[in-house]
């Protein structure tokens, strides 16, 4: 299983903060494109990926939205397919369904809770995941030793907070996808492509 952790300093933490203009809604448009980059192939949704969204914008930070879409069965009351056309609507509904003090499953595979960024990262570390943080000064992903069950951590257009980033370097291996700066959605697509290649070549176990 490959996992991604996306941290946004500005993404809203209440459903009523998300309107039609996604850029004005704390740049949640970046999170939407990141969801698409993590899960969508042509005519297919990945079943080997999980995404952790950490929203630290107003009014009630930090919200942890965990997404691992159901890819089998019928859509309806008890199951939901992830649709590119309505990612923002799904995130909005998840935020509306949050209840204080609960980790709540909004749809099968879609959970929300209040949890800070480093707590999520530490939990993944304690589960034995191999952690990698996107860092311009890190090792090139093409030559890096990517181990089984990797987790890749990245920030929004403002990047990861300096204090948290310093702590992350103690838990994670810094890697880069190149010298140029890419959108978060492009970054996860590049990482996915590298993992796909390694799996296809037998250099990384396939989920």
Role assignments for model-derived ranges:
Residues 29, 154-159, 181-185:
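Short, amphipathic alpha-helical segments
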Residues 11-14, 59-61, 138-141, 157-160:
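Short acidic, S/G/P-rich loop/turn micro-motifs used as interaction or catalytic elements
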Residues 2-132:
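RNA substrate-binding interface of SAM-dependent RNA methyltransferases
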Residues 148-151, 172-173:
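Active-site regions of enzymes building and remodeling cell-envelope glycoconjugates
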Residues 111-149, 159-167:
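Active-site cofactor/cluster-binding pocket
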Residues 135, 153-156, 177-178:
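Thr-Gly-centered strand-to-loop micro-motif
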Residues 56-58, 62, 67-69, 136-145, ...:
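Extended interaction regions within the primary functional domain
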Residues 162-207:
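Structured adenosyl-cofactor binding patch, chiefly the S-adenosyl-L-methionine
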């Amino acid at each position: 299983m490959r996992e991604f952790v996306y941290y946004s300093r500005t993404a809203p933490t209440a459903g009523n903060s998300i309107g039609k203009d996604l850029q004005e809604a704390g740049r949640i448009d970046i999170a939407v494109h990141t969801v698409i980059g993590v899960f969508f192939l042509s005519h297919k949704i990945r079943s080997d990926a999980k995404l952790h969204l950490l929203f630290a914008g107003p009014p009630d930070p930090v919200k942890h939205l965990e997404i691992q879409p159901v890819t089998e069965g019928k859509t309806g009351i008890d199951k939901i397919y992830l649709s590119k056309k309505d990612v923002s609507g799904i995130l909005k509904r998840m935020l509306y369904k949050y209840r204080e003090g609960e980790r709540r499953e909004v749809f099968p595979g879609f959970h929300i809770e209040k949890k800070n960024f480093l707590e999520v990262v530490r939990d993944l570390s304690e589960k034995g995941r191999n952690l990698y943080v996107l860092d311009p000064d890190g090792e090139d992903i093409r030559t890096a030793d990517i181990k089984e069950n990797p987790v890749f951590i990245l920030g929004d257009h403002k990047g990861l907070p300096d204090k948290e980033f310093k702590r992350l370097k103690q838990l994670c291996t810094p890697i880069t996808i190149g010298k140029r700066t890419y959108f978060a959605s492009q970054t996860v697509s590049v990482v996915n492509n590298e993992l796909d290649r390694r799996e296809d070549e037998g250099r990384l176990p396939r989920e």
